[in-house]
Each structure stands twice: as C-alpha cells, then as structure tokens.
C-alpha cells in the first residue's frame, strides 16, 4: 500500500513538474482545478555551547522553515465556492528521513470548502496558534525565539475548523478535534481552539488559544492549555512585536544517556498527542513575556532582536530568560540566507533548550548540559523554497 501511495505521489510530482516547464511554476491546471507541488529545504550550521563547558558543532534542519514537501489544490465550484486540499510531509534535510516515520503526511492532510462566508476544513491540520508565528516576533517564532523554546501546539488529527473572512478588521477561527472526543464517556480527550485577530492599518492585536481535556477521573485532572496574546506595529521600515503566553503545557523529558531534563516535555503535545491525565507537569503554570523588533536595512535585508522571560508562577523554580539577534537576506524570491545568535539562561530548576521551526537534530541531551545552564548558539543557514 505504501509503495502504491509513493508511486502515485511521484507521478503527481512528475506531472506537475512537466506542467511547470510551460507555466513557470510547479502547478498543473485542468478543468478549473489547480494542483501545486511546493516545499522548501532549510539547513544550517550551528555552534552551540553550554555553561557546563560542553560545545557542539552540527548541521541542523529547519531553523526558519522546516524542510517539507507538499501538495495543495483547489477547484472553482462557482458562485464564490472552492473545494480545497493540502497534503504536507515534514522531512529532515540532514538525513533524508521523514519527520514522523509513522505518517506519510505528518504536517497536514485536510480537505475543505471555501465559501463567501468563510472556510471549513476537515482532517489533520495546523493550529490557529501555529499560523500566527509571524505575528509573534522577528524570527517568525522559530530559532532564537524565547516563546518558541516553551513548545507550541502545532497540529492535531480529526480536526474540524472554521476560518472567517476578515470583517471590519476582525478575523475569527475555531477548531474542534474529535481525535479523542467521546462525549458522555470517561475517556473524552477532545482538543478545542479559538482565535481572534484584529488588523487596522499598521496595527495588529490578537489572541489564539488551545485546550485539551484529560480523561475523567485522571490522577492529574487538569485541562492543559496554551493562551497566546500578541500585538505588533508596522512602523514602515520594520515591526515592533509584543507577546504574552499563559500555559501549563510543560513537563520533564528523559535525558541521555540517563537522568531527566527539567523541561522539554508537553502534556498536550506539540504535534497531536492528547492529554493523558498522568503528567504532573500540568500542575505547573507559566507566564512568558517577550518583546521584539526588526528593521529593513535594505529592501531585501532585515535585521532583528528580541528578549524574553519564562516565569514559573507556581513554584518559582523553573524560570528562564533569553535573547536573540538575527539577519535575513532574500537573495532571490526563492532563496534566503540567514545568520542568528541566541542565548538562553536557565534557573537551577529549569531545563529549556533552543528550538527552531523543527526541533534540533542534534541538541544537548545530558541533564548536566541543560538543567540550570546557559546555552548559547550561533547559526548560519539557507532556505530554498519551491
């Protein structure tokens, strides 16, 4: 079965590639339907140090835009209605491996219909919070972002979504994942989302939130949530960003070769795991504060900086703070080169680590290098989009 699916995808890619010679894009249009092959390759060389004394040089994947291959399409049904689909697979550029070996399309696989009154989608799809990364800070909430090291719930299975048009500056979005939903049943683990964004001239403010319920009667009977408030101002030559997050979606994670990292786990998960009701990390609540700004020194060159704090408001022991600086150069419309520097300082009880659009292929994994340590990183990389 997997072989037949792979052959079908290959045939579709070849067909679209053939059409691209005539059209200048990786798209094919027939009878009002358009199918596009898209993706990117993002790789970077990193130099990372820990205040423990450890150092590491590595080729990593996905600082800014995780490597991926996708297919998307739409068909005009008339009267302002369109049928749509997206199928997207994450890849690791450093090894050629799938981001998730258990799924063919781990990032997205959904179908829907766009109407004059909004868009309806069904399937595995990105969260409302995930889509708003570019509203959060100059990195697009990727490598260098303090908000990003906390972990962002990114996508869920069996998700039903509605996205409104923008009316009077407002855009609303709601999701309900029935992946674990069993109404009136003790194992109901539904995941719900809501978002509201307002845009007026150079100003934007908004909220995006997600919550997952544990099974009834769980040992840790806490709803796990992630609430993100944001605002930004386009001052003409760049933007200023403010972000605040309130969440209990953090926990410990196993270290290597042994021991435990004080942070890095997520009771709600970041790519589709449901709340089991057994993770005591859900008992600890955090506030995250971050300020960021960027500036275009040239039409194709942007520089930026940020500073953020993670505050453990329950026990005051898992605090961290960090900063990031970076520069992005759009060499062509398809190629971007970037350089980044960032620092993350953990309190003795904290164990946060840097993370990009993709998790680091080669992170520090020993508790001695992470817990209570200051981790610094320099990165230089490139994104090629097609």
Question: Residue locations for each model-derived region?
Answer:
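Extracellular loop and loop/strand-boundary signature of outer-membrane beta-barrel proteins
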Residues: 54-57, 97, 146-148, 179-182, ...
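Short sequence motifs at beta-strands and strand-loop junctions characteristic
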Residues: 61-64, 101-103, 152-154, 186-188, ...
